[in-house]
């Protein structure tokens, strides 16, 4: 069964995402990061389809709002997105059909032992309004 095409979502990389971990990817992978970022942008435009086909993980959903984890691989690395340990946290406003890239990070950068607790702390510190929506 083919699903009807839905209009694309608008998206933006939040300044915190740009300044922090994404900057690390840009330095480490140079041109491959540009291609990877373009791929992430394309996924954001079709995030509803990615969720439908389990290509992104829904973490929280409250009303029109969703918090989603997206695994990604850096272009040219030949590692699957899941195995790469690279993730983006996305905030989705379904009413406006808009996606915000909140954080792009490597598990190695955010580190063990509790990755979830660490990204929740970042959300609470940098995105207080979003943290309130999801009671983080």
Feature-to-residue mapping (PLM):
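Basic, Lys/Arg-enriched alpha-helical interface segments
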Residues: 1-82, 95-96, 106-136
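Short, surface-exposed coil-to-beta transition loops
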Residues: 82-88
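Active-site beta-strand-loop-beta-strand hairpin of nuclease catalytic cores
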Residues: 92-101
């Amino acid at each position: 069964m083919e699903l009807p095409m839905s209009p694309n979502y608008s998206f933006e990389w939040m300044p915190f995402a740009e300044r922090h971990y994404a900057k690390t990817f840009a330095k480490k992978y140079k041109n491959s990061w540009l291609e990877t970022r373009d791929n992430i942008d394309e996924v954001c435009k079709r995030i509803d389809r990615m969720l439908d086909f389990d290509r992104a993980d829904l973490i929280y959903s409250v009303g029109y709002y969703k918090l989603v984890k997206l695994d990604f691989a850096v272009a040219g690395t030949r590692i699957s997105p899941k195995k790469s340990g690279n993730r983006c946290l996305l905030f989705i406003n379904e009413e406006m059909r808009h996606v915000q890239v909140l954080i792009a990070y490597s598990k190695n950068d955010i580190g063990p032992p509790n990755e979830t607790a660490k990204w929740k702390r970042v959300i609470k510190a940098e995105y207080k309004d979003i943290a309130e929506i999801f009671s983080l």
